[in-house]
Amino acid sequence: MCEEDVAALVVDNGSGMCKAGFAGDDAPRAVFPSIVGRPRHQGVMVGMGQKDSYVGDEAQSKRGILTLKYPIEHGIVTNWDDMEKIWHHTFYNELRVAPEEHPVLLTEAPLNPKANREKMTQIMFETFNTPAMYVAIQAVLSLYASGRTTGIVLDSGDGVSHTVPIYEGYALPHAILRLDLAGRDLTDYLMKVLTERGYSFTTTAEREIVRDIKEKLCYVALDFENEMTTAASSSSLEKSYELPDGQVITIGNERFRCPEAMFQPSFLGMEACGIQETTFNSIMKCDVDIRKDLYANTVLSGGSTMFPGIADRMQKEICALAPSTMKIKIIAPPERKYSVWIGGSILASLSTFQQMWISKQEYDESGPSIVHRKCF
């Protein structure tokens, strides 16, 4: 069996979207929602060939008749049966490959429970019979994708946000901070704010509409109070959005009030620090000698860092917290939505990485716990 001609598969399972493709490619082939939908009603049409579950885009398009569930919450897999369906869909329907013929690189949120990666390992080897696999930390991959080995990554997706300081390619576990505030919470908050305005969004299907509003119209204000004043005195910030039924809604200060919750979690009734303080606290937990390198290499990654204005605001906030002479640079790569996947594609195609894979043989000898020894 010659390993050289077999491309590894890279699967970045996010709480919101699954990104999958082949190592060495510069972008994922498949990007679809991490959703499993089940019919809400018994089928009335005879011979319609109704399935008992739908995955990804198909679930999204039939959302009106389905109950949608996300098997990954806050970066942790909470429903393994549904997770298996998502992986099955990834390999067989999206990538159209046989997983038993390719090594698979999976990703995981930092500070996840140990059982989570053991179960991932077990399913890959026992259900999908992969020849080899590896579990990589998402934020580290984002840093690789930006061409750095030292820096601090603020990775904010749909389910969880982290600040991960990395020095010479190694994450510093004692300084990693986790914030359970991310895209899904912002969507829920926008649902609540719109409900206060008299628009009702309640079902799982309607939540997806609100997510679309958030992605298309929200932005981060450089100065929140100023922006609120502007919004109150003029209609210059108002934008309209057409709902699927043709009704048009107008949103004003909600556009920046929604992402502001990342900087002020008290908006959501959370006691946590905002992303700017979390980043600062994370840097302060590191050795005093490397802080300068972290301030100068602060990399944003993940879908929830895609809001316009977020980099300038981070720059302003971190400058206010850091020592006044410190050089601060916020790096926001345009492809940051997929930078975890891109980093995985880079890593899995490095010749030096090939001895890092966990092989089927090693798994058979040691069991699922091998993952803690081979993957950090």
Swiss-Prot record:
GO terms for molecular function: ATP binding; hydrolase activity. It is an enzyme of class 3 (hydrolase). It is found in: Cytoplasm, Cytoskeleton. It comes from the Eukaryota. It catalyses: ATP + H2O = ADP + phosphate + H(+). The keyword Hydrolase applies. Pfam families: Actin. Actins are highly conserved proteins that are involved in various types of cell motility and are ubiquitously expressed in all eukaryotic cells. This is Actin-11. It comes from Limulus polyphemus (Atlantic horseshoe crab). The lineage of its organism: Eukaryota, Metazoa, Ecdysozoa, Arthropoda, Chelicerata.
